[in-house]
Each structure stands twice: as structure tokens, then as C-alpha cells.
């Protein structure tokens, strides 16, 4: 009910690479040229859809978006570029802290040395989009 006018036109499983996502996007846009949003489970899927949409000439950039559930410096950069339609990767769900490897190391060290540690680790889940990308994007 959040998007009563939305129609799911295709579900594609198993997209794990940028190339596979570009191929799936090509097929999607050939069979459904009016697609306005693509949701992806992982970053590579979104990056591939974004690359296809940006280069195909078949997409009205101001009317299209892709969203995912993954995080990397490249994803942050693409979301930042979407502020000026230089990317169509409009947002992502960021899982975990800013330093997951360090946090994991600290927890494991405490476990191995018999020190007390939090038994339940709740990683933060944050939606990152144009409204808060400046907090997460670090220009090189």
C-alpha cells in the first residue's frame, strides 16, 4: 500500500555481478521501457543497473532510480553523484558500523581472552540517500 501505483514487472534472482546486472537491465528495458525504479539486493546489481541506465540512452535520468542494500566507497560516490543526475543510484541501506573489521576483532579478542563482551551485537541499519549522503561520502 505504500506505492499503490507501482507495478512489479519482473523479478530476477541470482544477480551477483555488475555484468549480469547490465545484461538483466538491458532485457528489462527492452521488454518494459517505462520502468522507473529498479530495486537490487546487492551493490553489484545496483552498480550494473546504474551503468546500463546511464549509458543506454533509453532512460530519462531525472525520472529513474535504482536502490540497493549494500555499502562501499563506490556506492557512496554513486549516491553522491546522483545529486546532479551523474548517477541513478539514488540510495542504499547501509548495514553495520563504519569499521566492522575492527569491531569484530575487538569482540573476538575479548572472547578469546575471557573478557566480558556484549553477547548480542546489533549493527546499525541506515538508509543513505540524497538527504544524508554528505555524512557518509568522503571525496578523495
Task: Indicate residue ranges for each PLM-predicted region.
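A residue-level marker of the well-folded mature domains of exported/periplasmic proteins
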Residues: 1-140
Amino acid at each position: 500500500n505504500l506505492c499503490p501505483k507501482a507495478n512489479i514487472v519482473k523479478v530476477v534472482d541470482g544477480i551477483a555481478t555488475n555484468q549480469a546486472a547490465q545484461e538483466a537491465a538491458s532485457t528489462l528495458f527492452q521488454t518494459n521501457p517505462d520502468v522507473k525504479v529498479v530495486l537490487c539486493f546487492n551493490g553489484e546489481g545496483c552498480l550494473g543497473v546504474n551503468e546500463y541506465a546511464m549509458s543506454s540512452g533509453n532512460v530519462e535520468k531525472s525520472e529513474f532510480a535504482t536502490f540497493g542494500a549494500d555499502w562501499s566507497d563506490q556506492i557512496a560516490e554513486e549516491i553522491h553523484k546522483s545529486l546532479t543526475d551523474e548517477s541513478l543510484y539514488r540510495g542504499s541501506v547501509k548495514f553495520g558500523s563504519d569499521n566492522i573489521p575492527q569491531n569484530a576483532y575487538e569482540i573476538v579478542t575479548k572472547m578469546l581472552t575471557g573478557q566480558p563482551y556484549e553477547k548480542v551485537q546489533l549493527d546499525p541499519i541506515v538508509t543513505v540517500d540524497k538527504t544524508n549522503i554528505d555524512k557518509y561520502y568522503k571525496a578523495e
